[in-house]
């Protein structure tokens, strides 16, 4: 077994995706072959789901720590692994396919080959998934609420919990466009990142910093454009993505509808006859 297959299987096992063991025909392996060198794949196989410094990761490997650190930084910029910065110290960990690698590849998702791999593997993941960690949430009409009593599903709670925000292009609609199937909904600066994800995406060149005011404006405009706000994971302390999705472009919204897995909580939407 080579390191590209080993890496795909490791991510599958760590994040408990009930997929068959990978081989060279699988889209995830093809994606890694396109994105990583042999040495990068070997180093990535030494990571797990916890952030570790280069010195820890390379212990027992026949590679200099400085060289490994450069390779790790490069993989983080590519979007294959997550980089965490604490002061002047960097640490690295593996990410699940989604949310994680899928979104982090937005800078290269316009490449038709990469777009095809992402769509194919998304279909594979959906085929074995009972539910996605996503929830559709409403935008409060007054987003600056800062009280403890705010409903779990009100998006202002998530914004209140963080001070760092970023925006990036919609990867799903970018992929659609790369396939010649653009749906017409906006692509530019429609996905919002908060907290540690905002820091990672900005630092590695995948997104740009945004103010709270701009985030609120984007959310309001998304509603005006008929988009749906999706957030995952659902645990509010870990929720770091807010996607503004359309049913004609969002792969996960389309797949969630297919397997009836969009999560609902306290609120039920009804159409008033008035």
What annotation goes with each model-predicted range?
Residues 88-127:
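Short, amphipathic alpha-helical interaction segments positioned at domain boundaries
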Residues 92, 232-237, 260-274:
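Ferredoxin-like iron-sulfur electron-transfer modules
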Residues 61-77:
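Short amphipathic alpha-helical interaction segments
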